[in-house]
Amino acid sequence: MFGVSAGSENREEYFAGLARRFASDAKMFRCRAAVHVENKDDVVFWSTVLKHFCPDDRFHFLAGSRNEFGHETSGVTQCLKYVHALGPDFFICIDSDYRYLLHERGIDAKHFILQTYTYSFENHHCYAEGLDEVCSRIAHVPNRLFDFKRFLTCFSRIVYELFIWHLYFLRTDPVRFSKYDFNQYINMTSRESLISVCDNGHRVLEELEMKVKRKLAYFERKYPNAALENIRKKYEQMGLLPETTYLFLRGHNVYD
């Protein structure tokens, strides 16, 4: 019988019971541990990561599980319901979203939670240094049509300062420049701005830069005393630089 009563203790015990069962299943399958990921699309990515660091071990992956109401559920919220039941035999792997940048407590390997550090696993697939290799492997010819590294570096530099403002407002006034608003500003998939291979995306980057500069000018006029330099230094230590911004943005904005 699935489902539990409303009390938080009952919910914790319910998920602790599932965790024990998953760990037991992993042992039965002769795996080192059971691993709950957000959904089935994440399995390949995390399987590759764990294979790299634990080449001699096998893992039992779960792309979803039953929530407290008995419904089969996936996603990061479902993963995080197990936080009180994690250990070396059962752990979770999630997309960081902004959890890494905003120092969300308890989201680390010490608490048996692995994260992407980038916004999501899609950002890793967009890593500039590897895209040429992917194209060459698929097309069986060297990629000389589009310079991914140059495009993503230019894109990152254009949106970097706006992203700093976005992170600033997430701390001080989240409604002022929300995730939705920011993602709309950096969106490059409009019909009027199709990326051209011929000019290495120059036109779409120009249009994006004009849009971003207008928003930056508004923020600078409206909030002249915003202390951004400390924020830049703080995030620089975490790997957020003008050239690497694309790794920390919403993955689908970059991936699409």
Predicted regions and their residues:
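Acidic, divalent-metal-binding catalytic cores of TOPRIM
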Residues: 1-256
